[in-house]
């Protein structure tokens, strides 16, 4: 561009720029205008437009009925009375004593240790 052309621009009389009001450039004196309120969209704030508050909450779900307590045996009743907490007494221990149980398991272990395991042989598979 020529410098002469830039200097000649000041000689031209341009009209004053038009000022357009925007919502962000609103001043306090402009807030009193009712004409702009009619053109603007706003959320209704009256009581009839509000969502009603929840007054009641739903009832809790019904509780499952508890089963009635079973009657304990005579030895279990003695043990329960002696402790504050309920003890779980196995019926196997009441019927059998420990020596019978030990004899049973020792006989099972003795039988398995004497027999040797046999390996399977597959004739169609060759060893490498």
Swiss-Prot record:
Expressed in roots, leaves, stems, siliques and flowers. Expressed in the root elongation zone. Disruption phenotype: Increased number of smaller cells and loss of giant cells in sepals due to both a decrease in endoreduplication and an average decrease in the duration of the cell cycle. Residues 57-71 have a biased composition (Pro residues). The keyword Cell cycle applies. Induction: Up-regulated by double-stranded DNA breaks-inducing treatments. Up-regulated by zeocin treatment. Changing residue 62 to S: In lgo-1; loss of giant cells in sepals. One of its GO terms (cellular component) is nucleus. It comes from the Eukaryota. One of its GO terms (biological process) is defense response to bacterium. Residues 17-74 are annotated as: Disordered. Keywords: Cell cycle, Nucleus, Protein kinase inhibitor. GO terms for molecular function: protein kinase inhibitor activity. It is found in: Nucleus. Over-expression of SMR1 produces additional giant cells on sepals. Probable cyclin-dependent protein kinase (CDK) inhibitor that functions as a repressor of mitosis in the endoreduplication cell cycle. Cooperates with SIM and SMR2 to promote endoreplication during leaf development. Specifically regulates endoreduplication in epidermal pavement cells to produce the cell size pattern. Is necessary for giant cell formation. Positive regulator of effector-triggered immunity (ETI). Interacts with CDKB1-1. Interacts with CPR5. This is Cyclin-dependent protein kinase inhibitor SMR1. It comes from Arabidopsis thaliana. The lineage of its organism: Eukaryota, Viridiplantae, Streptophyta, Embryophyta, Tracheophyta.
